[in-house]
């Protein structure tokens, strides 16, 4: 499978996952999430879903537990929406890049304040 196709599938999967999680999954533990990236392996067997959660650490943990519990439902919904022979296995990962970017931005602002 080509890398470009895996990237296209990942982009489409990102859109579909946002819709499924926001509108179909009814678990109250799922907080306000943003899917930042979906990386699909070239053979389409695994999709790593990178996301951020607005809230404290407990809300982040609760959201990931709820997503793990709803993984089967999410995968079946994804399968009915996308034309794939095999729906990739979903692996949810917390994306630390937003926090890291905010930390760097704060450091830059602090440096400008000192000048």
Curated annotation (Swiss-Prot):
Q: Which UniProt keywords apply?
A: Cytoplasm, Ribosome biogenesis
- Cellular component GO terms held in the UniProt record: cytosol
Recorded GO molecular functions are: ribosomal small subunit binding
Q: Domain of life, per the record?
A: Bacteria
Question: What are the transmembrane regions?
Answer: none
List where in the cell it is found: Cytoplasm
Q: Please give a single GO biological process term from the UniProt record.
A: maturation of SSU-rRNA
Claim: Membrane is one of the keywords in the record: no
> Its biological function?
One of several proteins that assist in the late maturation steps of the functional core of the 30S ribosomal subunit. Associates with free 30S ribosomal subunits (but not with 30S subunits that are part of 70S ribosomes or polysomes). Required for efficient processing of 16S rRNA. May interact with the 5'-terminal helix region of 16S rRNA.
The UniProt family comment states: Belongs to the RbfA family.
The record describes its quaternary structure and partners as:
Monomer. Binds 30S ribosomal subunits, but not 50S ribosomal subunits or 70S ribosomes.
Task: Spell out the NCBIfam families in the cross-references.
Answer: rbfA
The name of this protein is Ribosome-binding factor A
Query: What is this organism's lineage?
Result: Bacteria, Bacillati, Bacillota, Bacilli, Bacillales
Coding gene? rbfA
């Amino acid at each position: 499978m080509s890398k470009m196709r895996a990237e296209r599938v990942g982009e489409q999967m990102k859109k579909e996952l946002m819709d499924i999680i926001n509108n179909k999954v009814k678990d109250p533990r799922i907080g306000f999430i943003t899917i930042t990236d979906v990386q699909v392996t070239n053979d389409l067997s695994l999709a790593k879903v990178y996301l951020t959660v607005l809230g404290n650490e407990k809300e982040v943990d609760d959201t990931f537990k709820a997503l793990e519990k709803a993984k089967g439902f999410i995968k079946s919904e994804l399968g009915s929406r996308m034309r794939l022979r095999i729906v990739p296995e979903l692996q949810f990962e917390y994306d630390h890049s937003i926090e890291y970017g905010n930390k760097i931005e704060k450091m830059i602002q602090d440096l400008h304040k000192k000048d």
